[in-house]
Amino acid sequence: MAKKVALAYSGGLDTSVCIPILKEKYGYDEVVTISVDVGQPEEEIKRADAKAEKISNKHYTIDAKEEFVKDYVFPLIKANGSYEGYVMGTSIARPLIAKKVVEAARKEGAVALAHGCTGKGNDQLRFEAVFRQTDMDVIAPMREMNLTREWEIDYAKEHGIPVEVTKSKPWSVDENIWSRSIEGGRLEDPSFVPPEEIFEWTTSPEKTPEQPRIVDIGFEAGVPVSLDGEKMSGYALVKKMNEIAGENGVGRTDMIEDRVLGLKARENYEHPAATVLLAAHADLEKLVLTRSELKFKKIVDDQWSELAYYGLVDEPLYADLNAFIDKSQERVTGTVKVRLYKGALTILSRSSPNALYSEDLVSFDSQTIDQKDSEGFAKYHGFQARMYRKVMDKQ
């Protein structure tokens, strides 16, 4: 019986060179490649399919776009998911991709699982958090052979593997419907100014439309369900928001990121829809949740984001946090109006049937509340600080 290994396959340089390496260096008879569609460009999927058909023994392309948005992106929105300002597009997709690879591997009777992640990044941990739940061997050629980008390019040429990257432009790009990451090459120098050519989803602000774009975003139970009153599927909504916000230059991040291993990395991201939807959701929460809920949920959201960034979505705590978050989102229903203009996002208004805000009570022109009633509260506000000052003054 053929000795099979299942490889998480993107069609990029790293995973493409893994195919001959797994045969030549590791002794596997067959390499089964699995590409998981979580919203990459259609041409990227087709390119990966065409390449895999030539160099792998068998190839799967699994459509997980709607599942990704429904089960991973929407929970991220409800949790205001962010790690050091990063919207975690790559992070949140890896567990789903890994799970789909495991499913295909079992179907094929593979004895091992492989990925093309390096030993310096986070993705190795995210994939293996899922892979190591199985009894299959886990292979990481990039890490185990300590491979460099230049070596991979030369190796690919020797084996007739077409590559899109070059030694002068060795950008590593990862895309899904939630974000696009660009790293590698000169981008690793934090003092290097990224060339405009690395951006594809977002228009440079000086080239955006001269008129602002106003969008109404409808939410139900913490999840975006409509744009300008038009209801649509989760995937379609995120895709449309990417187009609208990207055209107006919204959603670029250039940051120094603390990886799980402790290394600092320079990262460039594009995430138009994520920028807008996360901001709109957080704003709506402020309208409908109590001060205590918002304060505690911030702690929960931060812990949720860290687990998601680490790829630990099978941790019991992750499910516990989601239970609280889901309960908190039951009232997060309403509409947020945003303006997108020259790279800037502005929240214009928000409304909800569950709003805790009362225009009548808060108005300076209203006498619904007798202002004198707050005098008793004011007398004791800062009471302990006053007592402390008296004690200190006696010393």
From Swiss-Prot:
Sites where the protein binds ATP: 8-16, 116
Q: Note the InterPro entries from the entry.
A: Arginosuc_syn_C (IPR048268), Arginosuc_syn_N (IPR048267), Arginosuc_synth (IPR001518), Arginosuc_synth_CS (IPR018223), Arginosuc_synth_type_1_subfam (IPR023434), AS_cat/multimer_dom_body (IPR024074), Rossmann-like_a/b/a_fold (IPR014729)
Question: What does the UniProt entry say about where the protein is found?
Answer: Cytoplasm
Q: Where does L-citrulline bind?
A: 86, 91, 122, 126, 172, 181, 257, 269
GO CC annotation terms, alphabetical:
cytoplasm
Q: In which pathway does it act?
A: Amino-acid biosynthesis; L-arginine biosynthesis; L-arginine from L-ornithine and carbamoyl phosphate: step 2/3
Q: Which SUPFAM superfamilies match?
A: Adenine nucleotide alpha hydrolases-like, Argininosuccinate synthetase, C-terminal domain
Identify the Gene3D superfamilies for this entry: Argininosuccinate synthetase, chain A, domain 2, HUPs
Q: Where does L-aspartate bind?
A: 118, 122-123
Q: State the reactions this protein catalyses.
A: L-citrulline + L-aspartate + ATP = 2-(N(omega)-L-arginino)succinate + AMP + diphosphate + H(+)
| Disulfide bonds listed in the record | none
An example Gene Ontology biological process: argininosuccinate metabolic process
Keywords noted in UniProt: Amino-acid biosynthesis, Arginine biosynthesis, ATP-binding, Cytoplasm, Ligase, Nucleotide-binding
Q: What is its EC number?
A: 6.3.4.5
Any single GO molecular-function term of the entry would be:
argininosuccinate synthase activity
**Member of which family?**
Belongs to the argininosuccinate synthase family. Type 1 subfamily.
> How is the quaternary structure described?
Homotetramer.
Cross-referenced HAMAP family, in alphabetical order?
Answer: Arg_succ_synth_type1
NCBIfam families cross-referenced by the UniProt entry: argG, PRK00509.1, PRK13820.1
Q: What is this protein called?
A: Argininosuccinate synthase
Organism of this sequence: Methanosarcina barkeri (strain Fusaro / DSM 804)
